[in-house]
């Protein structure tokens, strides 16, 4: 049984890569971000609005973290989430961080969510500020400290395919050991 975590900031490429890894290695896929989006949608809120609410209501993060941890315990899974590597660090076999500079991530988010660049920038900056503060306050986790990761990749100059090949080779080497 293997547990692989792919983390990173919004727009860094974690979801794209996590899905590809899960498919390639025939593993289950689970996204903490999708759960957060489901909660926002069910409450009729934007991600920005739910992030602000979550800053004062730890029950949202607690529920997401509980569900994420339960999925990790089942094994044979690729977990995708900004905080996931810290939440399941004691059972994750491989922890990978994918990122890109802010301007690249904002462009990707605008394209993915079909919104203009200014809105993507506004929402992303607020979301990241609130998340960083919330994660430190609730968990004592500095999400800028990447020392827990086995592999860190800046995807700015890499295609989706090249990024995947780096990740795939890293995982294959780990699985052979």
UniProtKB/Swiss-Prot annotation:
Pfam families: Cytidylate_kin2. InterPro entries: Cyt_kin_arch, Cytidylate_kinase_dom, P-loop_NTPase. GO terms for molecular function: ATP binding; CMP kinase activity; dCMP kinase activity. ATP binds at residues 8-16. It catalyses: CMP + ATP = CDP + ADP; dCMP + ATP = dCDP + ADP. Keywords: ATP-binding, Cytoplasm, Kinase, Nucleotide-binding, Transferase. It is an enzyme of class 2 (transferase). Its EC number is 2.7.4.25. The keyword ATP-binding applies. One of its GO terms (cellular component) is cytoplasm. GO terms for biological process: pyrimidine nucleotide metabolic process. It is found in: Cytoplasm. HAMAP family: Cytidyl_kinase_type2 (MF_00239). Belongs to the cytidylate kinase family. Type 2 subfamily. This is Cytidylate kinase. It comes from Staphylothermus marinus (strain ATCC 43588 / DSM 3639 / JCM 9404 / F1).
């Amino acid at each position: 049984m293997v547990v692989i975590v792919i983390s990173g900031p919004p727009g860094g490429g974690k979801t794209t890569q996590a899905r590809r890894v899960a498919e390639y290695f025939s593993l289950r896929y689970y996204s903490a971000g999708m759960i957060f989006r489901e909660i926002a949608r069910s409450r009729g809120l934007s991600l920005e609005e739910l992030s602000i609410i979550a800053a004062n209501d730890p029950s949202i993060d607690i529920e997401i973290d509980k569900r994420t941890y339960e999925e990790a315990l089942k094994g044979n899974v690729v977990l995708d989430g900004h905080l996931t590597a810290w939440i399941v660090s004691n059972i994750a076999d491989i922890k990978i961080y994918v990122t890109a500079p802010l301007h690249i991530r904002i462009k990707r988010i605008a394209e993915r969510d079909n919104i203009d660049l200014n809105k993507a920038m506004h929402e992303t900056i607020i979301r990241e500020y609130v998340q960083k503060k919330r994660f430190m306050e609730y968990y004592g986790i500095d999400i800028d400290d990447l020392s827990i990761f086995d592999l860190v990749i800046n995807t700015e100059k890499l295609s989706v395919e090249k990024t995947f090949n780096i990740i795939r080779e890293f995982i294959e080497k780990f699985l052979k050991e």
